[in-house]
């Protein structure tokens, strides 16, 4: 991931009085102001919401209001630093920024985290909470509470964060503020009187946000005199500095030249530079307890794998006196795809490009793969379908590489008769029914708990869709007279099969979806394969539930037939599950009349020409299958 701390797109509106920011604060003056602020006047907070509710826009307004950035055409979505984030209008990577705000004559040091809204990037949100004491719970006045609003609330509540409810987009004609306030009270037990009404687009109501943050969110707790206790919250790779760490200090101070040790790996480092994001990387002489900033080492940390998120750092020699911070749960890939270069001669260059992206996205798993049809490639694991799509876009934009991606699949688990377990990520490696040990084995597939919100009028259609996708209803709740929250347990395989797109179609775009892993369930799984003239095509293979075999098999052969040209010999396309052929399509050959010029009585010549044509078709068929 390229985190070169570059600015975002433009914003030309300024409908409120923000402090002048034309002249950038000199580094020495900035450090002096920060040094004069005690930890009691620190506030660390994040903005959480459903996707497209206005988190990044509100972040821009707060940065402008505090004078951290100027209200110019160059500063829209300034915390969205990836091209794909600006193009899609979504936040993929949680970004941080430090602000200084004068409230009632006193300076406050505010640390803001802009978090992703999409469920695929929930791990980014969870890590952000570790560096915060509170959160702005943002809700779109036109949409109301949606699936990821509910999920983010429960995550924040579990972390015991102080919540400040904020209603955004109040300037929109479709805004229904009383409905949103009622939803907040009924679903989250948040007092409507505490909600802040604003429009992040125009700036209306934005000046009320920071006083509420200062008054309602507690300051961090820490002691500068204690030994260093530093939590690793995030990391990224820089070509010149090596691995750069985003850290939160609980105790002590850290400065350039300090010798630190990782309690997780035992490796020792010398600090090369410390600083804050203001909003870009701004070096400082020291980071103190309660602050969030960046650190890199000299010589630099070379491997991103050495930066274990949730790790604790302290001074060399103080290891026995510091209790490690609770670590983070590493996100597990839920979607796997095989990736191949469009031209095998580009394999080495594409490998370098993929490795560079994986350096900065630790949630992507990578291992080499090979296909008889497509050649050498990789098997990539992603957190979800959007994560996969974003990775492909970044590969194209940042490295100019195109790649062939197979259909997304989910892993399956096998418990063999002897009790040993095996997780199969590549469907081609899933054992067939002819495998000697498969009869006594137990097969499992991953399930997710899906939370769906929608208007009441679409409830019947959504239930029908979930049941058709092998879902089991867990709860049904009306959190408003016209809004429903529906909870289903659904196989992860059905989720990646464009369930969200089907939900949008069934509800005319009004449904929202959030999900979380709910573990493995025993299931009747079979391997569905595509054969062309009895030869398996390994790139087209999937592990599916037995109830889906016939439908998918017919879809495969029908679709594959459309992409195969007619030949001089018969092409037979079959979908098989175990020993059973579930669907078949035949492409008839071109026919050349080799007997047209023969006399009717020339039987031997007739037989000879027919045999020659038959042999020729065999050679063509063999040549076709070897391509």
From Swiss-Prot:
Enzyme class: hydrolase
Matches recorded under PROSITE patterns: G_TR_1, G_TR_2
Membrane topology field: Peripheral membrane protein
Residues of the tr-type G domain: 40-221
Enzyme Commission number(s) from the entry: 3.6.5.-
Signal peptide limits: none
InterPro entries registered for this protein in UniProt: EF-4 (IPR006297), EFG_III/V (IPR035647), EFG_V-like (IPR000640), EFTu-like_2 (IPR004161), G_TR_CS (IPR031157), LepA_C_sf (IPR038363), LepA_CTD (IPR013842), LepA_IV (IPR035654)
UniProt protein name: Translation factor GUF1, mitochondrial
């Amino acid at each position: 991931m390229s985190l070169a701390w570059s600015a975002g797109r433009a914003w030309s509106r300024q409908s409120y009085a923000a402090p002048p920011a034309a002249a950038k604060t000199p580094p020495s003056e900035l450090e002096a102001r920060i040094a004069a602020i005690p930890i009691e006047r620190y506030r660390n907070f994040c903005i959480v919401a459903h996707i497209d509710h206005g988190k990044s826009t509100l972040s821009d307004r707060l940065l402008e209001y505090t004078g951290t950035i100027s209200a110019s055409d160059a500063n829209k979505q300034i915390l969205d630093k990836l091209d794909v984030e600006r193009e899609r209008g979504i936040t993929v990577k949680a970004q941080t920024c430090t602000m200084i705000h004068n409230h009632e004559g006193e300076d406050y040091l505010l640390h803001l985290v802009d978090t992703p809204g999409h469920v695929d990037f929930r791990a980014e949100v969870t890590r952000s909470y570790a560096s915060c004491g509170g959160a702005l719970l943002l809700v779109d006045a036109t949409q109301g509470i949606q699936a990821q609003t509910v999920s983010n609330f429960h995550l924040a509540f579990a972390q015991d964060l102080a919540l400040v409810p904020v209603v955004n987009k109040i300037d929109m004609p479709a805004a229904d503020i009383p409905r949103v306030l009622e939803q907040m009270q009924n679903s989250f037990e948040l007092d409507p009187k505490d909600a802040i009404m604003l429009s992040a687009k125009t700036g209306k109501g934005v000046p009320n946000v920071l006083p509420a943050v200062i008054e309602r969110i507690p300051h961090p707790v820490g002691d500068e005199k204690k030994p260093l206790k530093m939590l690793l919250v995030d990391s990224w790779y820089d070509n010149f500095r090596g691995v750069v760490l985003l850290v939160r200090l609980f105790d002590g101070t850290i400065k350039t030249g300090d010798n630190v040790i990782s309690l997780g790996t035992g490796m020792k480092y010398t600090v090369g530079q410390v600083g804050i994001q203001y909003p870009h990387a701004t070096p400082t002489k020291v980071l103190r307890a309660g602050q969030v900033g960046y650190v890199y080492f000299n010589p630099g940390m070379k491997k991103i794998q050495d930066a274990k998120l949730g790790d604790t750092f302290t001074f060399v020699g103080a290891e026995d006196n510091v209790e490690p911070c609770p670590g983070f749960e590493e996100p597990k890939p839920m979607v796997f795809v095989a990736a191949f270069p469009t031209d095998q001669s580009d394999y080495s260059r594409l490998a370098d490009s993929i490795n560079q992206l994986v350096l900065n996205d630790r949630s992507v798993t990578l291992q080499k793969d090979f296909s008889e049809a497509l050649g050498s490639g990789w098997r990539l694991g992603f957190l979800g379908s959007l994560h996969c799509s974003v990775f492909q876009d970044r590969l194209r934009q940042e490295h100019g590489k195109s790649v062939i991606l197979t259909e997304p699949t989910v892993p399956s688990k096998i418990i063999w008769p002897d009790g040993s377990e095996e997780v199969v990520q590549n469907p081609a490696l899933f054992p067939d029914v002819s495998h000697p040990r498969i009869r006594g084995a137990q097969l499992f597939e991953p399930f997710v708990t899906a939370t769906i919100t929608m208007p009441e009028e679409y409830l019947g259609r959504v239930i029908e869709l979930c049941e058709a996708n092998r879902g089991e209803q867990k709860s049904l709740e009306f959190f408003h007279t016209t809004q429903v929250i529906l909870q289903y347990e659904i196989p992860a395989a059905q989720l990646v099969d464009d369930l969200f797109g089907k939900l949008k179609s069934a509800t005319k775009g009004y449904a929202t979806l959030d999900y979380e892993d709910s573990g493995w369930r025993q299931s009747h799984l079979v391997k569905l394969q595509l054969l062309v003239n009895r030869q398996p095509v390994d790139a087209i293979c999937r592990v599916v539930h037995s109830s889906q075999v016939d439908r998918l098999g017919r879809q495969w052969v029908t679709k594959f037939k459309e992409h195969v040209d007619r030949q001089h010999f018969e092409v037979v396309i079959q979908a098989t599950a175990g020993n059973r052929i579930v669907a078949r399509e035949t492409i008839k050959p071109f026919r050349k009349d080799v007997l047209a010029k023969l006399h009717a009585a020339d039987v031997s010549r007739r037989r000879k020409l027919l045999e020659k044509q038959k042999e020729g078709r065999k050679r063509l068929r063999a040549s076709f299958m070897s391509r």
